[in-house]
Amino acid sequence: MGKQVGNVQLMQKMNRLKVLNLVRRNQDIARPAIAEQTGLSLSSITNITTYLLEEGLLEECGTEQAERVGRKSTLLRFRTEAYGLIIASLNENHAEVSYTDLEGKIQACDTVEIVGLSAERVITRLEEHITTLLDKFGKENTLAIGVIFSSLVLDGSRFVLSSSMKWKNVDIKKSLEADTGLPVYVENISRSKAIWYSSTNDRDEKNMLFVDLENGIGAVQVYRGAINRSLLGEIGHTTVEKDGEPCFCGNKGCLEAMCSAKRVIRLYEEQTGTEGTDIAKIAQRYEQGDPAARYAVSDCATYLGIGLANLIMMSHPAVLVLNESDFAQCPMLITDAVEECKRRAYPALTKELRICRVMVGREETLRGAAVELCDRLFDLGSAYNPVQ
């Protein structure tokens, strides 16, 4: 008898999560549409949505704009302010610790300077600022903490290495969970950006590649609307030059070692014997025909083109999205890299390939991170799921 009751409760929870996650992804949706898309009866949908409304996870938001005769259905929406999230976004210079709602809308943000600090000291600073935010907004109202940065993350949240942070095997998850008592999820920031982009653009594309050129080079595949987690995406640590520049990972000739804004500047300064320039000035001199600028940009662009061609040959995307970021002030490097890519990849794979160049900002990245956190939290296997 107990087993039968348990099975009923499990099925009830599964259906509640199915409805909640459908509404999360389809704001302003009516109960009949939910029933149609989930395959559940309308009476079941009524019971489930009543529970979710009482728990504060859904809210009613007017009636549908339908031309049909008869009573219009009430629309439902995911209530993003039901709980809060803390998201820490790190780079080599600073960390931004934000308190957001469930869709990543910022309610408070602290910037922490971390230049020159050890990993242990950075974690301590994060703990201090997270504690301040929890005191302000309430730990009981906060579902989880997300930590996002350019990094190799395995098994969902196990951090391994970050070339940009110069960290290896730092257990940031364990440290923050022990200090806060909240679940902590560590994620590669490129994935957060890709999640935001795919949820707001090209949602119907079956196969999209998102390549992030900020603080290294990472790739994310979105296949049939979902992140392909079997593709690790560490294109930045694939070898493109046998005896190339040394990389923090311990290898030589990694793509992100051979193509970075820092390397463009270094190549230019080696050619000219100057110091103190920046990539924007090099781009300007490239346009003026400066041989040193053209050499520095073209050399790095060639390696990026090789990396992109390798990706295309392996995954055959319909859309290639390039987050320019570090090279936004040197757009000709991206242009040259795309041309190199097309020269090296099979023409049949690039003939109909659509290439988009974008700039994913801070707020968009946080929204992507929030989507990822909610996907993990509102999951049947999550021990921190608020749905019963």
Q: What annotation goes with each model-predicted range?
A:
Residues 1-31, 36:
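Extreme N-terminal segment that seeds HTH/winged-HTH DNA-binding domains in transcriptional regulators
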Residues 70-108, 209-223:
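Gly/Thr-rich phosphate-binding beta-strand-loop-beta motif of the actin/hexokinase/Hsp70
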Residues 8, 13, 21-24, 185-200, ...:
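Glycine-rich phosphate-binding/hydrolytic loop that grips phosphoryl groups
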